[in-house]
Amino acid sequence: MARNEEKAKSMLNRYLQLKGTESKQEERRPYLSNECDSLVDAEKWRRQILKEITRGITEIQNSALDEYKIRDLNDHINKLVREKGHWERRILQLGGPNHRALAPKLFDADGKEPLGTGTYRYYGEAKNLPGVAELFEKPEQTLHGTEKKTRQDLYKYIDSDYYGYRDDEDGKLEEIEREYEKYAIEQNVENWKKQQRDKFQINTNRFNNNNIKNSIAINKNTENKDEINIDDDEENDDNNNNNNNNNTENTENIENIQEEEEKEDIKFKSYVSLPSTSQIETILLEKRKEELRKRYTQN
């Protein structure tokens, strides 16, 4: 073994190794997975990232490393894991296999899963860093001696009773609703009575207004009737005066005509029925009412 190591470290072997690396054109991995359009190249870059991840995980198992080196290595491994996920999505877009569904889980050298959830995990000696263990400790016991319940434990007690689907079975809700129902019925009855009183008050006010209007109309009709009677009396007086004058003038003629009437026995008969004064008054009163009715209805 010592002889082989000496051969590897010899000047000629190192020269040949350097010459071989210079002859090869090293390809750099694209910064973004979308820049690669070949499925073969995408698979190659994914395998390269896997090699770097395994190399980093084996290196981070060394407990002799200082804290800063361990943190840098752990950050670099998480970065490579995220980059591997980008290349796996790109391979799936190019028509390749779904490596995310087929790939096995990552384990430490001890065969344990790394601590952490989501996109950041702690590998190897990073678990023993200060402050990391406290993040993943079990919840402490409360003052009553019981462990602090998680959200999943709380959801176990959520059932139909929690949502109130079986509140009617104990009968307490019916008693409360019965009291409230009685109160609601009383309130509705009082409101109905109040509405009826208001309607009755409105109807009485309308009836009183109609009575006032009718009384005003009757008073006006009586005044008009009195005026008509006064006019009729004046006309009758004028007619009486004229008749007296005519009677004095016609007395002489009547005496002369009486003899002829006695001889001829003329009988006068009216073929047209003339209305009386009471009928004329009623007709005029009806016309006056009709005019007042039209006037109030228009207003």
From Swiss-Prot:
Top-level taxonomic group: Eukaryota
Biased composition (Acidic residues): 229-238
Main localisation: nucleus
Subunit structure: Identified in the spliceosome.
Low complexity biased stretches: 239-252
Family: Belongs to the ISY1 family.
Region (Disordered): 223-252
Designated name of the protein: Pre-mRNA-splicing factor ISY1 homolog
